[in-house]
Amino acid sequence: MDIDVNQMEEKWIRYWDEKDVYRFEPADRDKVFAIDTPPPTVSGKMHMGHSFSYPHIDFIARYKRMRGYHVFFPWGFDDNGLPTERYVEKETGIKPSDSNVEEFIRLCKEISESSEKSLLEGWKRIGMSCYFKDYYVTSSPESIRISQSMFLDLVRKGRVYRDLAPSIRCPTCKTSISQIEMKDQEMHTKLVYINFSVGDRPLTIATTRPEMLGSCVAVFVNPDDARYRDLIGKEATVPIFGNHVRIMADASVDMNFGTGAEMVCTFGDQNDLDLWKKYNLPLKISIDKDGRMTEEAGPLKGLSISDARKKIVEILREGGHVVKEESIKHSVNTHERCGTPIEIFIEKQWFIKYLDLKDAFIENGRKIEWTPEYMRVRYENWVNGLKWDWLISRQRYYGVPFPVWYCADCGNTVYADESELPVDPRIQKPSKKCDRCGSTNLVPERDVMDTWATSSLTPRIALTHFGLFDKYYPEDLRGQGHDIISFWAFTTIARSKIHDDRIPWFRIMISGNVYDMYGEKMSKSKGNIVDIYSMIDKYGADALRFWASTVSQGDDIRIKDQDFTRGRRTVIKMYNAKKLIDILKGDRKIRLFEDVKHPVNRWILTEDSRIMETITTHMDNYEVSKARTALDTFFWNVFCDNYLEMIKPIIQKASAAGDYDTVDETVYTASKVMLDVAKAYAPIMPFIAEEIYQTIDFPGRKISIHVDSWPDEKRRYSDANEEVSYIVSVIDAIRSAKSAAKVSVGTRVKVASVKGRKDLIEKYRDLLSGMLRIDSMEIADGDAVDATVFP
C-alpha cells in the first residue's frame, strides 16, 4: 500500500502552523533548551546543503522538546551585507553605484522582504520546527541597534580602533574584507625568472607577480644561502623602472623556491607585508582599490591586474630581462565569496583589536562541548594562525552603519549616544557637536560593518528579539557547517568573550558539506546541482531528512539515490505497519494493560524497552545517525518482520477461542510499540510520525506527537525474552530453508522438518505453522537449530 507523501506532509505543515505547535513558552532556565539557529541569507534559493545541515539542528530540537524541554528555536534571516547587495544587483540590474544610499537601501529591504516570505515556505517544507510566525532579520532597526550598541561597547573597552593600516581588499567586490573571509585556493600561474642587476652582475629573482615590479622596495635572500652572502647590504637595480633597492637577508626566505632570491613589493602577499613591517621598508602602491594599476606601475598605468601581468612580461622579454618562465600550481589567498585573488592596501579602516586575546579564545573554545570533538582542533588551528586584528569596515551601501561622524575641523571621532541608536550617519545629521573643539562641521562615516560583525551577535539578537537575553544566555546549542568555523563560530566566541567574558553556548554541533554521488563539489559550471524541490517532489521531505541522518555528525555526505529511496521505503513501511495493526484491531478500542501475559507480547515490550534506551543514549550524545540505525534495525527486522507476523496467528487463534483478553492485550502491545517507534522516528521523520500518531487511537494523546513525551517506559520480561528470542531463531532457520529451496516466504509448504529444543518448538507449533504457512511440522531434538522444507 502506497501513500501520497507530499499531500500528507503539506497537511501536517498546515496543522502545526494552525495549532501553534512550535510556539515557545518561557520557563525556568533548567527547563529551557535554547538554540542559536543559523540565519540563512536571502540571496537565492534553498539548496541540498540546507536540507542536510539544518535538519541536524532540528533533530535535536524535536528530541529535546519531547524530553520535556521548552525549546527556544528561533528563526532569522541574515539579510544585510554583500550577499544581499549582489542578489539585488542580479535581480534588478541596478548597481549600488547607480543609486543613492537611501534608494538602494530601500530597494534591498523591499527585495529581501519578498525573498524572505517565499523562502519561509521552503524551510517549513523540509520540516523545520522553528517558530516562523515571529522571526528576526539582521537588517531590522532592532538588530542594527544591537550591533551599533556592541560597537560602542568595543569603544568603551578600548577594543576597536581606526587606523591607516594594511587591509585586505577584493578587487572584484570592491570592498575590504577580513582574514576570516579569505580562503586558500590552488591556481595555475607562471613563475617568471627576471634579471635584476647588481652593478655588472645579474641577480635573478623568480616571481608570480611581475606586474608588481613598480612596487618593489627590496630584494631578500636567506642569510645562510652562500650564493648571495656577498650581495647582502648592496643595492640591486629594478629592470624597466631603474630604481635601486637594498639586498637584505631574512631567515624566512625559502632557498629552494625559484632562485632563492625574492623581491618584496608593497604588497604582493602576506610575506611582503610581514617583511615590510619588520624592516620598516618604503611604501609604493601600484594597484588601486578597483584593481587598476597606478602611476607607480609606470607603463602599466590604468591596466587591470591580469592585463598588466601580460604586458610587463612582454616588456621584460623585449628588454632581455626574462630568463625563463615555468608553469606552476600554487596556493593563493582569495575572497571566499567570489574566488578573486586578494590584494593588500594601506588605508583607514576600523578594526576590532583581538590578537592579544588568542589564548583566551582558545580557553573559551575548550569550555564548549564540540560535536564532533575533533572540530575543536580546526577552531584552535584557526585562532593560532591569526595574524591581524579583525577588519570590520566595508565599502558598501547595505549594511550596519558605523554610529560615527568625524570633525572636519579637528579630525576628532564623534560617536552617537546609545539613546540615538539605531542611527545612519550617512542619512541622519548628528545631534551633538564635536566634544573636542565644539564644531558642528561633522562628516559621516560612509563605510558599513562587515556582515560577520553583526552575525557574530546572533545569540544576543535572537534572545533580545523576544526579551530573553538575560534569562537564557549563554544558549545551549549552536549548529553550523564546518566551512564557517573560522567565520561564525570563531567570531561569536570572540565577541562573547570581549563583551560578556562568557561563552555564547554550551555546545556547538558541526555539520559537513554535501557533494554529488562522485564526491565532487556541486556547482553550476559542473552541471551537477541537485534541485531540492525536485527531490522533495520525488521522495518527500521525510526521505531527505532520513538521508541527512545517514552520516555521523561532522562528516561530509554524497547525494545517492539509494539513501533517499531507503527513507521513502521507511515512510511507506511505517504507514503499512500501522494499517496492518488497524486491520488486526478491527473495531476494538485500545485497552491499556499495566502488565501483559502472552510471551510474544512480553518479548516485544522487552525489546522495545531495550532499543528505546539505546536510542535515547545515542540522542543524548548527539549521535543521531547511530540512533536511527538502531531504530531501523528494530523496526524493520524485529517489529515488522517478526512481531507483526507472529501476532497474526495469535489474534486469529485467540479470536476463534473467544479469548478476547489476549486479543486486546496484543492489539494494545502492537499499538504501544508502533507508537514508540513513531515517537523515536519523530525527530528525524516528523511528517510520517505525526500521521501515525494522529491515527493511533491511543488514550492520552496530545495535540501533536512533537509535544508528547519521549518513550522511556521500562518493561523487562527476561523469562519471555529468552524463550521468544529462541523461537525467532527457529523462524529465521525456516525462512532460510525456504530460501534455499527457492520457495518464497509467503508460499505454503507441505512439510517443515525442524531440529532444536523440541519442547519449546512444540509449544509454538501453531504460531510457526500459521506464520510461516506450513501444513505439517516434524520436530526433533537437536543441539543447534536447523530446518528443512519440502514444498
From Swiss-Prot:
Recorded GO CC terms: cytosol
Gene Ontology molecular function terms on file: aminoacyl-tRNA deacylase activity; ATP binding; valine-tRNA ligase activity
Localization annotation: Cytoplasm
Gene Ontology biological-process annotations: valyl-tRNA aminoacylation
Residues engaged in binding ATP: K524
Domain of life: Archaea
Pfam families: Anticodon_1, tRNA-synt_1
Keyword presence, Aminoacyl-tRNA synthetase: yes
Statement: the UniProt record of this protein carries the keyword Heme: no
Stored SUPFAM superfamilies: Anticodon-binding domain of a subclass of class I aminoacyl-tRNA synthetases, Nucleotidylyl transferase, ValRS/IleRS/LeuRS editing domain
EC number: 6.1.1.9
Broad enzyme group: ligase
Sequence motif 'HIGH' region, residues: 40-50
Entry keyword set: Aminoacyl-tRNA synthetase, ATP-binding, Cytoplasm, Ligase, Nucleotide-binding, Protein biosynthesis
Motif ('KMSKS' region): 521-525
Catalytic activity: tRNA(Val) + L-valine + ATP = L-valyl-tRNA(Val) + AMP + diphosphate
Functional summary from the UniProt entry: Catalyzes the attachment of valine to tRNA(Val). As ValRS can inadvertently accommodate and process structurally similar amino acids such as threonine, to avoid such errors, it has a 'posttransfer' editing activity that hydrolyzes mischarged Thr-tRNA(Val) in a tRNA-dependent manner.
UniProt domain comment: ValRS has two distinct active sites: one for aminoacylation and one for editing. The misactivated threonine is translocated from the active site to the editing site.
Family annotation (NCBIfam families): PRK13208.1, valS
Family indicated by similarity: Belongs to the class-I aminoacyl-tRNA synthetase family. ValS type 2 subfamily.
UniProt protein name: Valine--tRNA ligase
Organism: Thermoplasma acidophilum (strain ATCC 25905 / DSM 1728 / JCM 9062 / NBRC 15155 / AMRC-C165)
